[in-house]
Amino acid sequence: TACVLHKRLHLDRNCAAFDVNLGCSAFVYSAQIISALMANSDIDKGLLIVGETMSRMVHPEDKSSVMLFGDAGAAILFEKVPDNKLSGMLCSEGEGYKAIIAPAGGFRNLKPTEEAMLFSDGNKRTLYNTWMDGAKVFEFTIRDVPQTIKHYMEYENTSPDTYDYFIMHQANKYIHKQ
């Protein structure tokens, strides 16, 4: 996708273009990548274009997921400012990789059936469709995310009052209140 957009925007060939395929965390990782590239080079500006078309990845008859995933896009322009940094904390949770997964996604299973099947949770989908274990994602969000935010503020020697907003990537109102 990055190279397609590079062509459509008629960008110079000296302009780097690459994809970061990380789903929910792609924006945070991409912002850190752009920040690091700018801090360690003569790059003065970076354009981050994020987009998801998850409606294509969820089976329309999978009632457990179809209402949770949507499509969206945004573009953010980064500009180098002397003595200013974009700080962040990147984390991964490999133990929970099965909580949101397209079982036949990527190149893991090269010849799965494309036929929709009825799964044990009572929902219909193919092995190519994204599936989410809502209970596991909820548990992770309630247990780990607040601790990560606290750890980050300790690392940066800040408090909640330091920030104008905390913007969370979560559709669940109950989780936001936690």
Residue ranges, per PLM feature:
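Flexible, glycine-rich active-site loops centered on histidine and acidic residues
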Residues: 39-73
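Conserved catalytic cysteine-centered active-site region
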Residues: 1-45, 178
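Acidic-glycine-rich active-site phosphate/pyrophosphate-binding loop
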Residues: 1-11, 49-54, 114-122, 176-178
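Condensing-enzyme catalytic core mediating Claisen C-C bond formation in acyl metabolism
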Residues: 62-139, 143, 147
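Glycine-rich phosphate-binding loops at beta-strand->alpha-helix junctions
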Residues: 1, 163-178
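Acidic, glycine-rich active-site loops and adjacent beta-strand->loop/helix elements
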Residues: 22-25, 50-55, 91-93
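Phosphate/pyrophosphate-binding loops at sites that engage ATP/ADP/AMP, CoA/4′-phosphopantetheine
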Residues: 148-164
